Amino acid sequence: MTEPNLDEDGSKSSFQKTVVLRDWWLIKCPKEFEGKQFGVAGFEESVETRAMRVFTSSPITKALDVFTLLASDGIYITLRGFLNKERVLKNGFNPEISREFIFGFPPCWERVCNSCFEGDSFGTDVNTVPSTIEKACPPILSPCKYSNRNLKDNPAESREKSNVTETDIAEINDKGGSGARDIKTARRRSLHLQIKRILESSKVRKTANDGDHGSEFLNTAKRGDVERDGCEVINNEDSEWKLDESEVQNLCNDGDNGSEGFIKAKSSDVEKDKSEAIDNDVISPAVGSGIKHTGADNVDKVTSASATGESLTSEQQNGLLVTTASPHSLLKDLAKSSKPEKKGISKKSGKILRSDDNVVDPMNYSGTKVKSAENKRKIDASKLQSPTSNVAEHSKEGLNNAKSNDVEKDVCVAINNEVISPVKGFGKRLSGTDVERLTSKNATKESLTSVQRKGRVKVSKAFQDPLSKGKSKKSEKTLQSNSNVVEPMNHFRSEAEEAEENLSWEKIKRKIDFDVEVTPEKKVKQQKTNAASTDSLGQKRSRSGRVLVSSLEFWRNQIPVYDMDRNLIQVKDGSETNSAPSKGKGSDSRKRRNLKIK
């Protein structure tokens, strides 16, 4: 190591040779110096007056700190930046060296360089770098290379082994040249790979044991290719345990078994299309009747034809009524009727919704006994055609519902066994025997005249409980305590016309003159002028008889006023004319323009 030559007396100063590298990498020098063979190369820190140069050092003899090195020729090297990994691999070093030489030299840099150097010290081609990496770090393959996990398409013979063989260890030993150190590193790698392979196989066996519950399918799979290839193949199929819909329907149609048929139907997912059954009791579909029918013979299982997505058959043409309600409409009806102590009729499905979230079909309002299970989902059309006798016999149970296409729009209100017709009633009360049966012709808008349409009283589709008193938010009628219906104001068109005639439209109307500006006129304030006449001021006159103006007071903004003959009439104070403060620079000019326009 050469030191800078200094004079004996030290009268002259000198610079130490220093190189700053901003991008650096390790090299092996062609000539050793005192057993040192590793050096540093890199791009020199750029200077404005000088081009960028590549520096190659002699063997490093000492690392003063992490960033400062001393070469054998006495040059000090300062490192700035990180290690260039690509060039380090190109010079024959192992990729593991980048863990230690990240941004400088560690304290044990000589030992790390000797253990991580593999050969080709004077640089190799860049294309040989991937092969060097593969030899240094062999890849670890997963036990199952294919993503689809198919045992037939993925034979075990076509896979690569993940362990290191003895030939690989021999190659590493031949290339290393360091003897015992290379053998130790190769053994560590092979041991590490074997441990990983054992852990992966144990995980596969554990998953197979967890999924094995005594079934023969998994046992045969374990004997086969699952244990050999290490892939987990478990196929779970649940389609074999589905019940046939025909069997479920037969359970529902079995009316002789009574409540057992309902329990079986309930267990086989037919909860959507069944009526309420509690202790072999079926609630009557009539509104407000509250009568229960017992016995298996009287059980009527009400199902919906449209709930299963099927269209109505020819039963509708024969006069048979079948409930037409989709599952979505039933759910909406249940949500609307969730309030306590209220009942309502759905607009879409026509079902009566109770407070306990049960759906009851309002097909037979006469309150007759429910037929046997053989005649379920059907109502005789002859009973619907004679509602008067049925209402007379069972007037306490409810109303007769003549269900048609448009009856929902004009629903009758039943209060204390009396019916009020929304079309022809107008407050007229009819007894139970004289109930007027509404048909689709009377209910539709086509048969109604224009006067009846305009004068008809609107009735809400959502009913309120007849026992509840007070006003309904949706209804336009008021239910009082004596069950009388109070009609709202202005039912007829004639009353509205009279109200329009009585209004004084002349007071509301105003004439519009398009020639006048829309802006509101400001009231002109009658200002008190302090103008003084010439006589009162006692102005002097000239020889020609003209009045001479005395000196004006500028701070008061006095303005002389002349007539057409240029005679002085008076002197005004400008402060009163300009009493309002100016709103801008152009305020005076705007006033002058307005005066000219007028």
Swiss-Prot record:
Residues 335-403, 445-500, 520-542, 572-598 are annotated as: Disordered. InterPro entries: Centromere_KNL-2_homolog (IPR053090), SANTA (IPR015216). It comes from the Eukaryota. Keywords: Cell cycle, Cell division, Centromere, Chromosome, DNA-binding, Meiosis, Mitosis, Nucleus, RNA-binding. Signal peptide: none annotated. Expressed in shoot apical meristem, leaf primordia, basal parts of emerging leaves, inflorescence meristems, young inflorescences, developing flower buds, developing sepals and pistils, styles and young siliques. One of its GO terms (cellular component) is nucleolus. Its main location: nucleus. Residues 19-111 form the SANTA domain. Residues 538-572 are annotated as: Required for localization at centromeres. One of its GO terms (molecular function) is RNA binding. Residues 383-392, 527-539 have a biased composition (Polar residues). GO terms for biological process: cell division; meiotic cell cycle. Belongs to the KNL2 family. This is Kinetochore-associated protein KNL-2 homolog. It comes from Arabidopsis thaliana. The gene is KNL2.
